[in-house]
Amino acid sequence: MKITKAEVEHVALLARLELTEQEAETFTGQMDAILAYVDKLNELDTDGIVPTAHAVPMENAFRADEVTPSIGIENALGNAPKRAESFFRVPKVIE
């Protein structure tokens, strides 16, 4: 599958990216190489191969829940530029 510069520019537009002419040319070549590799992978015979998500079998690798001491309010807020009582003070985002 060959990708065109117009397709790269369209994807950039959808991603709200502003590309220079040089970047569009570079990405066209890079994406074309990636898609050529994917085409090569699609040619492989995978009949009889069990799909896997991990190279080694894994099941629910949970750790034990343990209560540990926290760092404390003074340490947590020590480098905060602004604070209000025991909270971080941040600029208002929603009017």
UniProtKB/Swiss-Prot annotation:
| Top enzyme category | ligase
InterPro entries referenced in this protein's UniProt entry, alphabetically:
Asp/Glu-ADT_sf_sub_c, GatC
> SUPFAM superfamilies this protein is in?
Glu-tRNAGln amidotransferase C subunit
Q: Which GO terms describe its biological process?
A: glutaminyl-tRNAGln biosynthesis via transamidation; regulation of translational fidelity; translation
Record EC number = 6.3.5.-
Q: Which GO terms describe its molecular function?
A: asparaginyl-tRNA synthase (glutamine-hydrolyzing) activity; ATP binding; glutaminyl-tRNA synthase (glutamine-hydrolyzing) activity
UniProt keywords (A-Z) are: ATP-binding, Ligase, Nucleotide-binding, Protein biosynthesis
Report the transmembrane regions from the record.
Answer: none
Recorded catalytic activity of this chain's protein: L-glutamyl-tRNA(Gln) + L-glutamine + ATP + H2O = L-glutaminyl-tRNA(Gln) + L-glutamate + ADP + phosphate + H(+); L-aspartyl-tRNA(Asn) + L-glutamine + ATP + H2O = L-asparaginyl-tRNA(Asn) + L-glutamate + ADP + phosphate + 2 H(+)
In the record, the note on similarity to other proteins reads: Belongs to the GatC family.
The entry's function note states:
Allows the formation of correctly charged Asn-tRNA(Asn) or Gln-tRNA(Gln) through the transamidation of misacylated Asp-tRNA(Asn) or Glu-tRNA(Gln) in organisms which lack either or both of asparaginyl-tRNA or glutaminyl-tRNA synthetases. The reaction takes place in the presence of glutamine and ATP through an activated phospho-Asp-tRNA(Asn) or phospho-Glu-tRNA(Gln).
Q: How is this protein organized at the quaternary level?
A: Heterotrimer of A, B and C subunits.
Know the name of this protein? Aspartyl/glutamyl-tRNA(Asn/Gln) amidotransferase subunit C
- According to its UniProt entry, this protein's organism is Geotalea uraniireducens (strain Rf4)
Question: Which taxonomic lineage is given here?
Answer: Bacteria, Pseudomonadati, Thermodesulfobacteriota, Desulfuromonadia, Geobacterales
